[in-house]
């Protein structure tokens, strides 16, 4: 009987890193691999997103203590060398215990110490960069990785553009023309703030909807983020608008397919998932995103007619209300069809193939 191969998947921080990692982890497991996940545990009061999402899916969950330094104070920066040494040592312990045949990094600061140690310990390293502007961790690790993949073109030298690893549900939705064919009445609006929510959208959208006559007002599903549900509920009550509110959407693919229009941030996973489903979207990039990468992500679709882009500073309740009232389904289905032409749906298979080629 052949030995079971093992992969150590490194990803953490936000859904933009975690969900592509889960797609790869699940595909490897289906092919008989033993998969361990390396992430951060967070704190008792604020556990990390990966610690909440990964263990319930049946993967062994390993942790080290490391987090980002951008925007932190001088004390955090001064302690960085000591924190790195600790994270390097913890990473070595994890790698020696797990004994992975391949290490797969999908971004987040947690991937840096373990990625470096995996190379020093002679483990093949496969990287995937989700954003159109590479993060600092992947910029460094790409120079020592065995294989590098990207979700967008021309992001890293010597990288292969394959799209984002997607959960299968995103590639199984009906074509936009079929979905839109029988739709009548008020628009179905989905507001998505990303895995952590979006305070600005939570405040702006209810005010915009209040400016639209109730008879023609869109039907709304609004994802708040785990810590913002009560504040969002108060915003809708103050605006006198009814909406379905949820902290988290479990079946995002179906929600995207059911919506006529999505108002959302422009994280890499969101943009590539919208392309895979073929959905119409108004992108409002997070203004504080590192290197303004969300704007670049959105432009990838918008430049080809696959959605609209408005900066947060330019979007007011009045402007959004006017846009929603003037938007017709014909324009939405055309946008959805254009978005779908930009899809790349085989990233997961590329990463799995690389793992199988590199495994000893």
Curated annotation (Swiss-Prot):
A Gene Ontology term for the protein's cellular component: plasma membrane
Key words of the record: Cell cycle, Cell division, Cell inner membrane, Cell membrane, Cell shape, Cell wall biogenesis/degradation, Glycosyltransferase, Membrane, Peptidoglycan synthesis, Transferase
InterPro entries per the UniProt record, alphabetical: GlcNAc_MurG, Glyco_trans_28_C, GlycoTrans_28_N
Enzyme class: transferase
Reactions this protein catalyses: di-trans,octa-cis-undecaprenyl diphospho-N-acetyl-alpha-D-muramoyl-L-alanyl-D-glutamyl-meso-2,6-diaminopimeloyl-D-alanyl-D-alanine + UDP-N-acetyl-alpha-D-glucosamine = di-trans,octa-cis-undecaprenyl diphospho-[N-acetyl-alpha-D-glucosaminyl-(1->4)]-N-acetyl-alpha-D-muramoyl-L-alanyl-D-glutamyl-meso-2,6-diaminopimeloyl-D-alanyl-D-alanine + UDP + H(+)
GO biological process: carbohydrate metabolic process; cell division; cell wall organization; lipid glycosylation; peptidoglycan biosynthetic process; regulation of cell shape
The protein's Enzyme Commission number: 2.4.1.227
Binding site for UDP-N-acetyl-alpha-D-glucosamine: 14-16, 131, 167, 195, 249, 294
Topological category with respect to the lipid bilayer: Peripheral membrane protein
Listed Gene3D superfamilies: Glycogen Phosphorylase B
Pathway in which the depicted protein is active: Cell wall biogenesis; peptidoglycan biosynthesis
SUPFAM superfamilies named among the record's database cross-references: UDP-Glycosyltransferase/glycogen phosphorylase (SSF53756)
GO molecular function: UDP-N-acetyl-D-glucosamine:N-acetylmuramoyl-L-alanyl-D-glutamyl-meso-2,6-diaminopimelyl-D-alanyl-D-alanine-diphosphoundecaprenol 4-beta-N-acetylglucosaminlytransferase activity; undecaprenyldiphospho-muramoylpentapeptide beta-N-acetylglucosaminyltransferase activity
Location relative to the cell: Cell inner membrane
General function of this protein: Cell wall formation. Catalyzes the transfer of a GlcNAc subunit on undecaprenyl-pyrophosphoryl-MurNAc-pentapeptide (lipid intermediate I) to form undecaprenyl-pyrophosphoryl-MurNAc-(pentapeptide)GlcNAc (lipid intermediate II).
NCBIfam families referenced in this protein's UniProt entry, alphabetically: murG
Family: Belongs to the glycosyltransferase 28 family. MurG subfamily.
Protein name: UDP-N-acetylglucosamine--N-acetylmuramyl-(pentapeptide) pyrophosphoryl-undecaprenol N-acetylglucosamine transferase
Name of the gene encoding the protein in the UniProt record: murG
């Amino acid at each position: 009987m052949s030995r079971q191969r093992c992969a150590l998947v490194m990803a953490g921080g936000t859904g933009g890193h975690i969900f592509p990692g889960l797609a790869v982890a699940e595909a490897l497991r289906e092919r008989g691999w033993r998969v361990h996940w390396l992430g951060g545990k967070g704190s008792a009061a604020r556990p990390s997103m990966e610690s909440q999402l990964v263990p319930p899916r049946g993967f062994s969950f390993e942790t080290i203590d490391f987090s980002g330094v951008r925007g932190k104070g001088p004390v955090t920066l001064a302690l960085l060398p000591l924190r790195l040494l600790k994270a390097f040592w913890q990473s070595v312990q994890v790698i020696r215990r797990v004994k992975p045949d391949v290490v797969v990094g999908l971004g987040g600061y947690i991937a840096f110490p373990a990625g470096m140690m995996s190379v020093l310990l002679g483990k093949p390293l496969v990287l995937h960069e989700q954003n159109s502007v590479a993060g600092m961790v992947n910029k460094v690790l790409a120079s020592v990785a065995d294989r590098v993949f990207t979700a967008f073109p021309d992001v890293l030298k010597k990288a292969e553009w394959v799209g984002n690893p997607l959960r299968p549900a995103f590639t199984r939705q009906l074509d936009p023309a079929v979905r839109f064919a029988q739709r009548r009445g008020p628009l179905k609006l989905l507001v998505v703030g990303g895995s952590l929510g979006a305070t600005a959208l939570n405040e702006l959208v209810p005010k915009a909807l209040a400016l639209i006559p109730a008879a023609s007002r869109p039907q709304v599903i609004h994802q708040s983020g785990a810590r913002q549900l009560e504040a969002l509920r108060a915003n809708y009550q103050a605006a006198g608008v009814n909406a379905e509110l949820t902290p988290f959407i479990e079946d995002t693919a179906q929600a995207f397919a059911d919506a006529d229009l999505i108002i959302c941030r422009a994280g890499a996973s969101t943009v590539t998932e919208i392309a895979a489903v073929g959905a119409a979207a108004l992108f409002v990039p997070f203004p504080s995103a590192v290197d303004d990468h969300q704007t670049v992500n959105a432009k990838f679709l918008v430049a080809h007619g696959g959605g609209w882009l408005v900066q947060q500073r330019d979007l007011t309740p009045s402007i959004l209300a006017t846009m929603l009232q003037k938007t017709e389904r014909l324009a939405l289905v055309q946008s959805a069809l254009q978005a779908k032409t930009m899809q790349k749906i085989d990233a997961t298979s590329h990463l799995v193939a690389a793992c199988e080629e590199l495994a000893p």
